[in-house]
Structures are given as C-alpha cells and as structure tokens.
Amino acid sequence: LSAGPNGGSIAKLSVK
C-alpha cells in the first residue's frame, strides 16, 4: 500500500 498524507498505509484507506 502507498503511504497517504498521514504517512500511513492504513491511514491512506481512511483518507482516500
């Protein structure tokens, strides 16, 4: 998984 704005792969799923 790619890192999102929060710098977390799991967080990416929440943001995106």
Curated annotation (Swiss-Prot):
GO terms for biological process: defense response. Keywords: Pathogenesis-related protein, Plant defense. Belongs to the BetVI family. This is Disease resistance response protein. The lineage of its organism: Eukaryota, Viridiplantae, Streptophyta, Embryophyta, Tracheophyta.
